[in-house]
């Protein structure tokens, strides 16, 4: 995974991903730690971070003063007037997504971002889902919903990565930017 220095981390519905006990119980602690690690890394490297949806009670991922918070007007983070113009102004070409899959906002955002031409990475172990019941009344556990959602996104819509890979890529992107700035 190679990230440009303009890679934007979208933390989608962190309040769901971390604070909602109904979400994929098996990976709850890991997802919360990974979301917090991604947020900390983007902050430390001075990379752009955008919070989409509500505000988490978890201090490690709560928006800091000056960080962008965007409310969704629909399923996707692009539903509304704020995100796309902001990304255009930043010259962003790459989005890294993490957070909750409860309302399908992360999935809808990934699809829309790909349609708009962004390179999209989804951090699998920094996403959580909720149980779902299909049309036949069968209960699908959150872990299965999460796996299926990631499988649908994998390929032409998004590249699925783990948090360790995304963290290394963020550090490498900033290091490249510093080297290039030193040559200028």
Residue map of PLM features:
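Active-site-adjacent betaalpha module
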Residues: 1-8, 34-40, 44-47, 55-184
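N-terminal nucleotide-binding beta1-loop-alpha1 segment
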Residues: 8-14
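Short acidic, Gly/Ser-rich segments with clustered Asp/Glu that frequently serve as metal-coordination loops
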Residues: 15-21
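Short glycine-enriched, charge-decorated loop/helix-capping segments at active-site entrances
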Residues: 22-29, 137-139
């Amino acid at each position: 995974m190679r990230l440009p220095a303009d890679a934007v981390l979208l933390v989608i519905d962190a309040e769901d991903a971390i604070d909602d006990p109904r979400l994929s119980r098996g990976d709850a602690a890991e997802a919360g730690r990974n979301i917090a690690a991604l947020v900390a890394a983007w902050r430390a490297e001075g990379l752009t971070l955008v919070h989409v949806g509500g505000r988490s009670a978890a201090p490690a991922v709560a928006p800091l003063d000056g960080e962008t918070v965007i409310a969704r007007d629909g399923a996707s983070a692009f539903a509304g007037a704020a995100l796309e113009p902001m990304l255009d102004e930043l010259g962003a070409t790459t989005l890294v997504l993490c957070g909750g899959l409860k309302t399908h906002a992360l999935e809808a955002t990934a699809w829309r971002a790909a349609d708009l031409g962004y390179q999209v990475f989804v951090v699998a172990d920094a996403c959580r889902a909720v149980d779902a019941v299909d049309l036949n009344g069968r209960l699908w556990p959150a872990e299965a919903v999460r796996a299926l959602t990631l499988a649908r996104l994998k390929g032409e819509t998004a590249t699925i990565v783990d948090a360790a890979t995304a963290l290394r890529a963020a550090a490498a992107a900033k290091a490249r930017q510093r080297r290039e700035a030193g040559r200028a």
